[in-house]
C-alpha cells in the first residue's frame, strides 16, 4: 500500500478585499434599528435580510460572486449557493461578540465595514459536533 495524506474536515478560509466605497451602506446602517444580543453589549440589526435593500445592491453582487468563487474553486462544485440571510452587528466600546456556530450553513461569511485597529481580529474556534 502506498503512503497517502488525507485532509479530513479541513476548514478553508477565503479572504477577498472589497475595493469599492461603502459610504452609502455605512450611512444606511446608521439609520436602522438594532437589538442587544445575549446581554454582552453586542447589537444585531432587526433586519436579517439586509441584502434585499437597494442600498446593498453592490455588496449583494460582490458577496454572490465571492460565494460562487468559493463554491467553484474550493468546494469544487458547480452547484450555485444562495445567500439566505444577512444582518449587521455593532460592537460598541467594551462589548464583545459571543462565540457561536452556524450548524445549518454550508458557507458562512463576515464583512467588516469599520474596524478599530486596536481591537483583536475575528477569532475562530474548532468545535467537535457529535
Can you say where each PLM-predicted feature lies in the sequence?
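Residues at beta-strand starts and edge strands
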Residues: 10-12, 82-84, 105-107
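Non-heme Fe(II)/2-oxoglutarate
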Residues: 1-76, 96
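Sterically constrained small-residue positions within well-ordered secondary structures
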Residues: 6-7, 79, 100, 115
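A short coil-to-beta-strand element that immediately follows conserved catalytic motifs
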Residues: 76-86
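Catalytic core of non-heme Fe(II) oxygenases with the double-stranded beta-helix
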Residues: 88-130
Amino acid at each position: 500500500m502506498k503512503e497517502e495524506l488525507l485532509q479530513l474536515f479541513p476548514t478553508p478560509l477565503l479572504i477577498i478585499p472589497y475595493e469599492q466605497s461603502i459610504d452609502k451602506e455605512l450611512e444606511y446602517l446608521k439609520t436602522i434599528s438594532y437589538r442587544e444580543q445575549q446581554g454582552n453589549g453586542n447589537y444585531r440589526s432587526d433586519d436579517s435580510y439586509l441584502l434585499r435593500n437597494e442600498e446593498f445592491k453592490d455588496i449583494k453582487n460582490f458577496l454572490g460572486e465571492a460565494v460562487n468563487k468559493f463554491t467553484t474553486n474550493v468546494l469544487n462544485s458547480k452547484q450555485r449557493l444562495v445567500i439566505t440571510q444577512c444582518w449587521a452587528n455593532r460592537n460598541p466600546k467594551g462589548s464583545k461578540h459571543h462565540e457561536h456556530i452556524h450548524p445549518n450553513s454550508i458557507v458562512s461569511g463576515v464583512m467588516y465595514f469599520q474596524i478599530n485597529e486596536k481591537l483583536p481580529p475575528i477569532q475562530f474556534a474548532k468545535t467537535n459536533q457529535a
